[in-house]
């Protein structure tokens, strides 16, 4: 299956930045993933948590026990470059970044975006 198909129909999803913190982006995405009716594996990633919404939480994407089709990164912009690199090293097929603090905040954010 091609990487683009896996992005739109992933069998396994890792949410980097998963949390139960009320009002956070990581919580909102996690809730939406958990409400999905299709059968796919969901892996919360957060080095500060052991469990998120009843699922075992992993410290890093490399710790996930199966191949990840899609990683969603919902963390501050300064963490994104190293997390994308970790996803590449873990052979993740696709990455979606949901973050702020890039070009819209000025020159420093633009450097991160590039």
Q: What does each model-found stretch correspond to?
A:
Residues 1-114:
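Catalytic-core regions of core metabolic enzymes
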